[in-house]
Amino acid sequence: MGDEVQALVIDNGSGMCKAGFAGDDAPRAVFPSIVGRPRHTGVMVGMGQKDSYVGDEAQSKRGILTLKYPIEHGIVTNWDDMEKIWHHTFYNELRVAPEEHPVLLTEAPLNPKANREKMTQIMFETFNTPAMYVAIQAVLSLYASGRTTGIVLDSGDGVTHTVPIYEGYALPHAILRLDLAGRDLTDYLMKILTERGYSFTTTAEREIVRDIKEKLCYVALDFEQEMHTAASSSALEKSYELPDGQVITIGNERFRAPEALFQPSFLGMESAGIHETTYNSIMKCDVDIRKDLYGNVVLSGGTTMFPGIADRMQKELTALAPSTMKIKIIAPPERKYSVWIGGSILASLSTFQQMWISKEEYDESGPSIVHRKCF
């Protein structure tokens, strides 16, 4: 695998697919992980209607389509649609021939073995890639931060994981998953804005609320105190202009929505918040490496982009950890794409080139080769 062929890096998230070329510092293509099919066949005959649409095109035509997310909580659940997303990635977004490039794919922590095999099989048999590799998302985020040991709190659109990593290897017994992420926060914000008298119900309106969330929400350092401030003054109020020109005002919703990350009971969930989950993950690790984990807590994924989240994590973990423990939260500015960036770094390392699963190895051993070569 010489330098003349650029490897492709594809990070398939529940909400967005990030794709591009190894060695680049950012993904070339970022589009929604959705596949849409016409609700009524035959209505648009003669308009050159396709039987399916992917990504932004599906998003823009959603009025006439039924939308599906093939990746739920980070795990691929619909392989036919997943294949369509990959096809769209290669041919429409990156405009490359997959049979000419090695492909690095990412997977969720604790991804079922059968899923890794299926990804491997599709790459070699459907797309005829010359070589491929499957890497764990959180591990790539850690690499992107320049570390090989630490605990990654990776929170995207569909799922949140805490993943302790020691010298480059994820520790599976200590990985914890929380089914609370960006999509849930958007839904919760829709709900509390409705209480204020604004109605957001359709999928189109959900996109507006997602934008409000991304632009105006933040994490309070002290929730109770912030609620008190919001009640006694209008200092925290912000206005937002809707696409139709109407202007809405949003106050304590700005920090009430992301607070659910720390208090899942807001969403009617019984699970521990992200701070406790991180702590529980660390406590499942050998006592000798805990210090290294507390000192390297790396935030990753779009749902860690809220202003104030790092300071709040620092405060909450300090309260949980032994009093002498040094705690450091690392929040890289590019953390929305750090999984992809880590993949770009890994796939362009000269030492990584012998790690690829080649077509020859696949033909000889079959899909199970992925468990021997990717760990």
Curated annotation (Swiss-Prot):
Gene Ontology cellular component terms for the protein in this record: actin cytoskeleton; cytoplasm
Protein's UniProt keywords contain Nucleotide-binding: yes
Reactions this protein catalyses: ATP + H2O = ADP + phosphate + H(+)
EC number: 3.6.4.-
A Pfam family per the record: Actin
PTMs per UniProt: Met-1 may be removed after translation.
GO function terms (MF aspect): ATP binding; hydrolase activity
Keywords linked to the UniProt accession: ATP-binding, Cytoplasm, Cytoskeleton, Hydrolase, Nucleotide-binding
Single GO BP term: phagocytosis
Alphabetized InterPro entries for the sequence: Actin (IPR004000), Actin/actin-like_CS (IPR020902), Actin_CS (IPR004001), ATPase_NBD (IPR043129)
CDD domains: ASKHA_NBD_actin
Subcellular location: Cytoplasm, Cytoskeleton
PANTHER family from the UniProt entry: ACTIN
Additional detail: There are at least three actin genes in A.castellanii.
Family: Belongs to the actin family.
Function of the protein: Actins are highly conserved proteins that are involved in various types of cell motility and are ubiquitously expressed in all eukaryotic cells.
Protein name: Actin-1
Species of provenance: Acanthamoeba castellanii
Origin organism lineage: Eukaryota, Amoebozoa, Discosea, Longamoebia, Centramoebida
